[in-house]
């Protein structure tokens, strides 16, 4: 798994290790959160509800930020001064030991920060996502997108 993204075969092989040879249906899927008006020095928390009928293999996290919904192009992208902490309720594990800088952890356009390894999140669980701004004065709008595949296992 050395490429910029995980290949389909790599994701299939990863999933099959955990489902003990059962037939699998993998469907590309994503979950999006929008944090509106994150003011300087504040924090906000939102929850992602994982589908009840499938597990989710997370392959990448992306974000897009803007200040006051201002237009952007490649050279004027906003690098938000915010930290993210993600907790999986199914395993009660945090993705990192503490909140980390969003730009260091998530992909923002041409800034590529891939997860080192896919992560399985159980169906019917939730991800609690906290963003904390450390901006001096800007109010941010930030979308955080969780990219991956839904996994449905069937009886043999």
Which residue ranges define each predicted feature?
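Beta-strand-centric surfaces of beta-sandwich/beta-rich domains
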Residues: 1-156
């Amino acid at each position: 798994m050395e490429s910029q993204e995980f290949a389909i075969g790599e994701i299939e092989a990863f999933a099959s290790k955990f489902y003990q040879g059962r037939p699998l249906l993998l469907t590309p899927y994503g979950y999006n959160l929008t944090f509106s008006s994150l003011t300087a020095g504040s924090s906000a928390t939102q929850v992602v509800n994982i589908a009840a009928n499938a597990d989710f293999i997370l392959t990448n996290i992306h974000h897009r930020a803007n200040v006051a919904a201002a237009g952007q192009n490649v050279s004027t992208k906003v690098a938000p001064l915010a930290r993210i902490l993600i907790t999986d309720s199914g395993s009660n594990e945090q993705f990192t030991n503490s909140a980390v800088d969003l730009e260091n952890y998530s992909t923002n356009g041409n800034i590529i920060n891939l997860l080192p390894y896919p992560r399985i999140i159980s169906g019917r669980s939730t991800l609690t996502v906290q963003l904390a701004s450390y901006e001096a004065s800007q109010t941010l709008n930030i979308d955080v997108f969780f990219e991956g595949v839904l996994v449905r296992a069937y009886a043999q």
